[in-house]
């Protein structure tokens, strides 16, 4: 099993990011790790299943920017918050979990994408 809490701890130390969570989408469909008392800590199993159709994350509406979540080469979805100030969000898929990462409004979309994909790639390399 991947060390989910270490990934969240690493992300929370970086001042560029506002929120992060890791959600199991294969078996239990619950939050495995998250920054406490933030939006993504409120993700529930229904959100995990329907997120591709109507993006509502932690009770916040989002706009899909790109969706390659099911592509085995890309395995990521980029979104923007549907309210001001606009923040970039990336969801990356490992073999067993989804990694949710939201940048601050001043953080570039590419920084959020790169960080989320890097974590997912490392976890995928371990087989999780």
From Swiss-Prot:
Listed name of the protein: Profilin
Pfam families: Profilin
Protein role: More likely to influence phosphoinositide metabolism than actin assembly.
Keyword RNA-binding: no
Secretion signal, residue range per the UniProt entry: none
GO MF annotations in UniProt: actin binding
Keywords: Actin-binding
Family (UniProt): Belongs to the profilin family.
UniProt keyword annotation of DNA repair present: no
Gene3D superfamilies: Dynein light chain 2a, cytoplasmic
């Amino acid at each position: 099993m991947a060390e989910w809490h270490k990934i969240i701890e690493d992300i929370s130390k970086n001042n560029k990011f506002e929120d992060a969570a890791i959600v199991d989408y294969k078996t239990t469909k619950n939050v495995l790790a998250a920054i406490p008392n933030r939006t993504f800590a409120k993700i529930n199993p229904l959100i995990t299943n329907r997120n591709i159709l109507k993006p509502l994350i932690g009770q916040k509406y989002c706009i899909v920017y790109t969706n390659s979540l099911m592509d085995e080469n890309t395995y990521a979805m980029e979104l923007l918050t549907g309210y001001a100030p606009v923040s970039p969000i990336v969801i990356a898929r490992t073999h067993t979990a989804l990694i949710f990462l939201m940048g601050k409004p001043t953080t570039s979309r590419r920084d959020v994408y790169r960080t989320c994909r890097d974590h997912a790639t490392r976890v995928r390399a371990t087989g999780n």
